[in-house]
Swiss-Prot record:
Residues 222-241, 323-332 have a biased composition (Polar residues). Terminal protein domain (TP) is hepadnavirus-specific. Spacer domain is highly variable and separates the TP and RT domains. Polymerase/reverse-transcriptase domain (RT) and ribonuclease H domain (RH) are similar to retrovirus reverse transcriptase/RNase H. Mg(2+) binds at D470, D590, D591. It comes from Woodchuck hepatitis B virus (isolate 59) (WHV). Residues 398-639 form the Reverse transcriptase domain. This is Protein P.
Length: 884
């Protein structure tokens, strides 16, 4: 049925004879449909012209919102946070894959090397203050969202997905280190790494015996025992560790005094002749700036754990003994580690033994509330004093490594949303690294192939048994180089963010900036913390502290991540495909699809792949593993042997939205954009395709309103109620050729020549399109040869609207191949000349598979390699099945 038959009969400006002519033979109707006058008359009848500016626009239509209609995000206080398994790919992944699948191809090696490890080094990076770490997307649930997001980040850290910043040059994480992390090891499982300890001892001995004495002591030879010097300093360090009362400046002064005493004939004195130690320190320490050791008493055991007065004495003594036994391996510390440290030593009630960036003593907010008197009935002091042991202020992972300088800043904010539109019970972390997609810090991401609709139909429209697999937390499988951590920083500002007048640091030893901390003591905060305490328990203290973390695995908020994930999964699919040539295996992002002729054979392949993936460290989501039978559901489509159709849920959603559109009201262009996005998904399955939406495209491009008439709306509804599948292309030889001039057209086949003229001159592209439509109508050929690039592209939205709609209906399922004008046998008939008698050019269509590497011809598996399936395959190996 003609797509415009009902529409033309409902337009009163078109007479009955004119309608019959427009619906008549194509050689007469197609040139008329290209006329400008007819298109304007139909547009006036359908009210498709853009409205005037004095009308008031509609900004919301039921489920679709437009301009000035920001939809508030919904926070779920009962969100379930996902649990992440130990995601750790095998350390020698490429060698392990070669054991399973044999020698890898060049492309497979290249793709895997891009991901092992991934590298991300933008030219410029903007750093934001820590207070912007957690975005306040839910103002009514700010406190609940803050603790839920902080808990999500700590969950990722415990799974080995994030690094925790200890100081500006040190990172700590949980899990097994990779080979590139071994080179930066500081400590592993609480033990100081040998290479790091040896390098620190060597540098310290050289600094003591050589550089320092040469610059600041007399020129005559001096006998200095570096062993005694190091032991003396170590004894002082242990003593100060036990007492917990020695400051950083005092340690430096003691070391300078020791160097002065061992120098023979030196006149350097400290603390004598009426000069204060502070003055002497300032006058001398400048010469020792680059060679002074930083005293860090919490290198290995540095958790600030807070206990109440009742249970403090016994626990502190046991911690002192355990700590002093390990202090011999910590006698030297890198410079700046203590000055920039974010951790503290084992704490005693009311005492902090760490320094902040200004050399003063910062205060734990939780401890401060304990040591102050309650300000009222809703004071946080009542919550803090309810437990004797709140646990550590921070934690240290299994592995500590060195890193490039990492500032106390972040590069992107985080917040929580629903896991997907159909699952609001679970949460998903959103990382905003949009600075790398705009502005002067924009990064041009690499492009990768995405399967289009025709490619999926060509490759997957087969009568096979299908199975789909889903990689659990696929992005978090791919590791990142530690050097990229300073560009991928997230964090939490701590509970202090809810009181902007307060800072967690103190100045000159007093608590001047902590005097306003009781501004947090409100009824809302108090009741919220009580409810959160039921959820998190003593972990609430850890979540209330500020922290900074960097991604150790691939984050989802960077444009590089989809590219790297696509390379990784396509390389894995290529290996499986090469070893099982009798089945179909392809991957797109984190979805892996297997196809075989029988379900028994598919089960065997599935069991083998699961065991291989488990050994490699790739985790599959068992809950999302689905057996589809002969109807594969993939990317929102239903793929069968007869073609591809959209899933029912998309068709129902489209019909519901389209019926809710009001008639004869100007809708703003944002509503048109959102509606067009929904209609575009199903448009390839309609008779007129994308051309039916050209009036909406025009309104969106003009950034103006659009008015739906009742005729246009009913016509769209009739189009989208009748859907046709997209079928696979066939590899056939071209036997029909078409060509045109502005005044005539010509068609050449193997047995006849056809030609004709137009009633009036037409643009050359329009004439070529009409000639192709006539060739399709009269010969029924599925493959046409033409020399016009516009017709070859298949994009008909640049033609007159009525002609584009009818041409899309006629040429549906038709393929084109290019033939040069000199070799086109229809060229001379289109000019009204007799053609030269010569054979037709032999052009064969190759079905479109170039948009994605789902399948490629590969060499057979070596016969010496053991079979991959334990029992004999139902498919004969001598006749492998090859996708079309």
């Amino acid at each position: 049925m003609h797509p415009f038959s009902r529409l033309f009969r409902n337009i009163q400006s078109l007479g009955e004879e004119e309608v019959q002519e427009l619906l008549g033979p194509p050689e007469d109707a197609l040139p008329l449909l290209a006329g400008e006058d007819l298109n304007h008359r139909v547009a006036d009848a359908l009210n498709l012209h853009l409205p005037t500016a004095d009308l008031q626009w509609v900004h919301k239509t039921n489920a679709i919102t437009g301009l000035y209609s920001n939809q508030a995000a919904q926070f779920n206080p009962h969100w379930i946070q996902p649990e992440f398994p130990e995601l750790h790919l095998h350390n020698d992944l490429i060698q392990k894959l070669q054991q399973y699948f044999g020698p890898l191809t060049i492309n497979e090696k290249r793709k895997l090397q891009l991901n092992f490890p991934a590298r991300f080094f933008p030219k410029a990076t903007k750093y934001f203050p820590l207070i912007k770490g957690i975005k306040n997307n839910y103002p009514n649930f700010a406190l609940e969202h803050f603790f839920a997001t902080a808990n999500y980040l700590w969950t990722l850290w415990e799974a080995g997905i994030l690094y925790l910043r200890k100081n500006q040059t040190t990172l700590t994480f949980k899990g097994k280190p990779y080979s590139w992390e071994h080179r930066q090891l500081v400590q592993h499982n609480g033990q100081q790494h040998k290479s790091h300890l040896q390098s620190r001892q060597n540098s310290s001995m050289v600094a003591c015996s050589g550089h320092l004495l040469h610059n600041h002591l007399p020129s005559e030879p001096v006998s200095v025992s570096t062993r005694n010097l190091s032991n003396n300093i170590s004894d002082k360090s242990q003593k100060s560790t036990r007492t917990g009362l020695c400051s950083y400046k005092q340690v430096q002064t003691d070391r300078l005094e020791h160097l002065a005493r061992i120098s023979c004939g030196s006149k350097i004195t400290i603390g004598q002749q009426g000069s204060s130690p502070k003055t002497s320190y300032k006058s001398i320490s400048s010469n020792f700036r680059n060679q002074t050791w930083a005293y860090n008493s919490s290198r290995n055991s540095g958790h600030t754990t807070w206990f109440s007065s009742a249970s403090n004495s016994n626990k502190s003594r046991s911690r002192e003994k355990a700590y002093s036994s390990n202090s011999t391996s910590q006698r030297y510390s890198p410079p700046l580690n203590y000055e920039k440290s974010d951790f503290s030593s084992p704490g005693v009630r009311g005492r902090i033994t760490r320094l902040d960036n200004n050399g003063t003593l910062p205060q734990c907010l939780w401890r401060s509330f304990y040591n102050t008197k309650p300000c009222g009935s809703y004071c946080i002091h009542h919550i803090v004093s309810s437990l004797d042991d709140w646990g550590p202020c921070t934690v240290t992972g299994d592995v500590t490594i060195k890193s490039p300088r990492t500032p106390r800043r972040i590069t992107g904010g985080v917040f929580l949303v629903d896991k997907n539109p159909n699952n609001s019970s679970e949460s998903r972390l959103v990382v905003d690294f949009s600075q790398f997609s705009r502005g002067h810090t924009r990064v041009h991401w690499p492009k990768f192939a995405v399967p289009n609709l025709q490619t999926l139909a060509n490759l997957l429209s087969t009568n096979l048994q299908w199975l789909s697999l889903d990689v659990s937390a696929a992005f978090y499988h791919i590791p990142i180089s530690p050097a990229a951590v300073p560009h991928l920083l997230v964090g939490s500002p701590g509970l202090e963010r809810f009181n902007t007048c307060m800072s967690s640091s103190t100045h000159n030893g007093n608590d001047s900036q902590l005097q306003t901390m009781h501004a947090l003591c409100t009824r809302h905060v108090y009741s919220s913390l009580l409810l959160l305490f039921k959820t998190y328990g003593r972990k609430l203290h850890l979540l209330a502290h500020p922290f900074i973390m960097g991604f150790r695995k691939l984050p989802m908020g960077v444009g590089l991540s989809p590219f790297l994930l696509a390379q990784f999964t396509s390389a894995i699919a290529s290996m499986v495909r090469r070893n099982f040539p009798h089945c179909v295996v392809f991957a797109y992002m984190d979805d892996l699809v297997l196809g075989a002729r029988t379900s028994e054979h598919l089960t065997a392949i599935y069991s083998h792949i699961c065991s291989v993936f488990l050994d490699l460290g790739i985790h599959l989501n068992v809950n999302k593993t689905k057996w589809w039978g002969n109807h594969l559901h993939f990317m929102g489509y239903v793929i069968t042997s007869s073609g591809v159709l959209p899933q029912d849920k998309h068709v129902k959603k489209l019909s519901r939205y389209l019926r809710s559109v009001p008639v004869n009201q100007p809708l703003d262009y944002k509503i048109c954009e959102r509606l067009t996005g929904i209609l575009n998904y199903v448009a390839p399955f309609t008779l007129c395709g994308y051309a039916a939406l050209m009036p909406l495209y025009h309104a969106i491009a003009s950034r103006t309103a659009f008015i739906f008439s009742s005729l246009y709306k009913s016509w769209l509804l009739s189009l989208y109620e009748e859907l046709w599948p997209v079928v696979r292309q066939r590899g056939v030889v071209c036997t029909v050729f078409a060509d045109a001039t502005p005044t005539g057209w010509g068609i050449a086949t193997t047995c006849q020549l056809l030609s004709g003229t137009f009633a009036f001159p037409l643009p050359i592209a329009t004439a070529e399109l009409i000639a192709a439509c006539l060739a399709r109508c009269w010969t029924g050929a599925r493959l046409l040869g033409t020399d016009n690039s516009v017709v070859l592209s298949g994009k008909l939205t640049s033609f007159p609207w009525l002609l584009a709609c009818v041409a899309n209906w006629i040429l549906r399922g038709t393929s084109f191949c290019y033939v040069p004008s000199a070799l086109n046998p229809a060229d001379l008939p289109s000019r009204g000349l007799l053609p030269v008698l010569r054979p037709l050019p032999r052009l064969r269509l190759r079905p479109q598979t170039s948009r994605i590497s789902l399948w490629a011809a590969s060499p057979p598996v070596s016969p010496r390699r053991p079979v991959r399936v334990a029992w004999s395959s139902p498919v004969q190996t001598c006749e492998p099945w090859i996708p079309p």
